[in-house]
Amino acid sequence: MRLLTLSGLFFMLFLCLCVLSSEGRKRPAKFPKLRPCCHLSPRSKPITWKGNHTRPCRPCRKLESNSWVVPGALPQI
């Protein structure tokens, strides 16, 4: 009887340790293909000799505005 109780408690402790130890781990992120960023403009699109547009760089992210808005506030007129 005691052996069954102790083995059950040991199993529950082992199960909790396994779950909690793997909870905070993240999978390793895949590294994207690193290309320099460039600003899109009509002149920045190079054309191959066949006439196809190429994009050797990725578009740069737009900078977010630093304006701060109070959530739920009504606009002032």
From Swiss-Prot:
One of its GO terms (molecular function) is receptor ligand activity. Residues 1-24 form the signal peptide. InterPro entries: GPR15L (IPR031713). The keyword Secreted applies. Disulfide bonds join 37-60, 38-57. GO terms for biological process: defense response to fungus; defense response to Gram-positive bacterium; G protein-coupled receptor signaling pathway; lymphocyte chemotaxis; mast cell degranulation; negative regulation of cell cycle G1/S phase transition; negative regulation of cell division; regulation of keratinocyte proliferation. This is Protein GPR15LG. It comes from Rattus norvegicus (Rat).
